[in-house]
Amino acid sequence: MWSYIQNLSNIKFCGLVTNPRGIEVRELIGTNIWINDNKVLMKCPGIRDVTNPQTKEGQYLRAEFVWYMSGSLKTDFISMFGKMWSRLGNKFSEQNIYNEKINSNYGYHVFYKPAAENLTLLEEFDLDMENVKIPQFYWAKNELEKDRNSRKAILQYTWPLIYLPGVNDFTCTQTQHFMIRETYDGLEELYNLVNIRSSDAIKGLTFDLPWWSFVGQYMAKLFGIENTPMKVSINSSHYYSTDEALVDQLIQLNKSNSFRMTSLILREFSDMTLRIRSAVRFVKSYFNDKDLYGIFDKVKLLSESDPISAVMLLCNTIVNEERFKRVSRDVICEINNQIFDSVFKY
């Protein structure tokens, strides 16, 4: 079982060169990474530092979190921070509601997509659909509440749409599985088990690790569990030849004991509530629009009982409201920072 940097080093020195889509990558098949203490944020100042909101990668991490929490399948918001998204929309007929949409908004799959979104067959048999109409995350939570030792609390990050002709965004993460088990000292841990079919160790895993950690920590917090060890099983672990120089820099840092992964910690809900209210005040200072007052008030009210849902509502508003699309990228960056920091400490 490897750490992030061990995995990267093994790709470099043991990986094979392949050329999917005619692009050279160095790749290892069937690797595993183990993460403890939520150390999922790369902090290598001057080289790659997602903890710094001023770096390109730091800005992308925060924008991606806001976009994920919005549940939006559109690319206009996230394309401001990662241009590749503008090329990944589905190429369906104009009549298809998923035309130009993407399939890899992980927040949609976790917090918005019903657990049985595509099981219309159940409705034909007049079966009770209420339990499976709820989003996957809460379905998994319910399974653990019914049986704390359940092996069924699993989230599916894919859907049948990805198999259609015209799809450019074939979802990488496949599943995220939660199991609660008691350790030898009598404490409970929530095991956060992720399977991903294809993982770019530089441009993908850097941002995926924080997301998976957040989802696992949120589930654990709902059960009063503090420790959330995470295992990531990667079918294709690789990096592109264009990132070779950066890979060499990171490996060299590790040789001098200067490579750092730091912890991303989900705030206590009470702290989150106060910070979400502060974030709303900040957003209102830029958008003193009476048409938005009702939404802002609902976010503040919701933050008292369910701060994560409050964040989802705020992010959904920012990503989808036309007013927010007319402001500068710098303002959006600062809003992203406010929201990210209201949820996490690091």
Residue spans for each PLM region:
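Terminal, non-catalytic protein-protein interaction segments that mediate quaternary/complex assembly
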Residues: 1-346
